[in-house]
Amino acid sequence: MMLSTEGREGFVVKVRGLPWSCSADEVMRFFSDCKIQNGTSGIRFIYTREGRPSGEAFVELESEEEVKLALKKDRETMGHRYVEVFKSNSVEMDWVLKHTGPNSPDTANDGFVRLRGLPFGCSKEEIVQFFSGLEIVPNGMTLPVDFQGRSTGEAFVQFASQEIAEKALKKHKERIGHRYIEIFKSSRAEVRTHYDPPRKLMAMQRPGPYDRPGAGRGYNSIGRGAGFERMRRGAYGGGYGGYDDYGGYNDGYGFGSDRFGRDLNYCFSGMSDHRYGDGGSSFQSTTGHCVHMRGLPYRATENDIYNFFSPLNPMRVHIEIGPDGRVTGEADVEFATHEDAVAAMAKDKANMQHRYVELFLNSTAGTSGGAYDHSYVELFLNSTAGASGGAYGSQMMGGMGLSNQSSYGGPASQQLSGGYGGGYGGQSSMSGYDQVLQENSSDYQSNLA
């Protein structure tokens, strides 16, 4: 007898958003109206490479009717968490369970470990000394850097065998200098992901003060700041080799440029012509005044986004679609003016349905769709409205407060939104962010009047 398509693929749902401490019994209670195949044995949790819960699980049910009942539990709460429920199948479940977790083929036999908490400026020689007596393969060490070319405090090391890597893991919480070093299992795939630049910040980083035209490093072609050049040429010139390309290190303990087959054309694709997001993004601004959204509910529609920004009236909404044809939870929203884009930032961290949404300003006053660059700022307004003399003044900030910045005030060409006076004056957190945005927006409009 031929099995139906559903029978061959099984009766499976995927659950996302589970509390980290969630047990199989709690999942059973959540789906108490559904018949789970083989009880708790039909609940298959997904784990990270380090063996920690990922907050996701597959649940095998007894029939298609039970699947329909389970899907009705979508967006119900477990504790204080909203839980999402999706239809899945046994093929997806088997593949995911095989390729995730600490014992997956991607992690089990390649001898990689990841170090975290390295002292600032830690060299490869110090890491080799830390693992004295354990054989590291040639071209088997890398120290990732951020979008400004600074050390992230992490390192990836590949040992000659998985057995040696297991010995290396026993040095967890030992010291280099005064710092305790954390060591985790890793894989070549994880190392490869660290060669992708931070997507949103790097894709549209404002040029640094030394990147103005004629400074020897133009930004008209791909718009990268000095940090990109440091990353490309190698922030660790000494030791066992620096970067000779974005694909890796040239010799010694750095990864060879052919190890992962990466190149600058791939890593920096989609970084010019006002294209936002990944190199494959098709969105192109016509006004140059945009806000990027992240964390959207996966079922959010364009109308939901228009309503989110009400009473502002966006000109256009572009919901990002990934290469697999699914929404990414991100979108670009285009406004008619810089002032509207700034005012829209007051909605940063506001909720859409059950999700809070992060906003990133991508607009500069006085520019239009043909301008050469837009600021892409994460969690920090970095607009230069009214700036004069060609100075950018404001610095790229991550999501970590003001980074010991004691004052953001100064000359008009260097103040936030150019000439509002005052400044942040030692503020070390993001409290009051919405209020500052709203005040700046209204002040700017009154100044124009």
UniProtKB/Swiss-Prot annotation:
Looking at the record, which segments are called 2 X 19 AA perfect repeats? 354-392
Chief place where the protein resides: nucleus
* Tissue specificity statement from the Swiss-Prot or TrEMBL entry: Expressed ubiquitously.
Modification Omega-N-methylarginine, positions: R233
Write down which residues bear the modification named Phosphoserine: S23, S54, S63, S90, S310
What SUPFAM superfamilies does its record include?
A: RNA-binding domain, RBD (SSF54928)
The RRM domain, residue ranges: 11-90, 111-188, 289-364
Give a yes or no for keyword Protein transport in this entry: no
Which segments carry the region annotation 2 X 16 AA Gly-rich approximate repeats? 234-433
Swiss-Prot/TrEMBL keywords: Acetylation, Disease variant, Intellectual disability, Isopeptide bond, Methylation, Nucleus, Phosphoprotein, Repeat, Ribonucleoprotein, RNA-binding, Ubl conjugation
Keyword Phosphoprotein set for record: yes
Q: Which residues carry this modification: Phosphotyrosine?
A: Y246
Cross-link of type Glycyl lysine isopeptide (Lys-Gly) (interchain with G-Cter in SUMO2): positions? K35, K87, K98
Gene Ontology biological-process entries: regulation of RNA splicing
Post-translational modification Dimethylated arginine, affected residues = R233
- Give the Gene Ontology MF terms in alphabetical order: RNA binding
Name positions with the PTM N-acetylmethionine: M1, M2
List locations, semicolon-separated.
Nucleus, Nucleoplasm
Which cysteines are cross-linked by disulfides? none
Q: Which InterPro entries match?
A: ESRP, Nucleotide-bd_a/b_plait_sf, RBD_domain_sf, RRM_dom, Znf_CHHC
Q: How is this protein annotated for GO cellular component?
A: cytosol; membrane; nucleoplasm; nucleus; ribonucleoprotein complex
Q: Can you say where the sequence repeats lie in this chain?
A: 234-249, 354-372, 374-392, 418-433
What is the annotated quaternary arrangement, including any partners? Answer: Component of a ribonucleoprotein complex containing mRNAs and RNA-binding proteins including DDX5, HNRNPH2 and SRSF1 as well as splicing regulator ARVCF. Interacts with TXNL4/DIM1.
Function of the protein: This protein is a component of the heterogeneous nuclear ribonucleoprotein (hnRNP) complexes which provide the substrate for the processing events that pre-mRNAs undergo before becoming functional, translatable mRNAs in the cytoplasm. Binds poly(RG).
Q: Which disease is it linked to?
A: Intellectual developmental disorder, X-linked, syndromic, Bain type: A form of intellectual disability, a disorder characterized by significantly below average general intellectual functioning associated with impairments in adaptive behavior and manifested during the developmental period. MRXSB patients manifest developmental delay, intellectual disability, autism, hypotonia, seizures, and dysmorphic facial features. Only females are affected.
- Full protein name: Heterogeneous nuclear ribonucleoprotein H2
Name the species this protein comes from: Homo sapiens (Human)
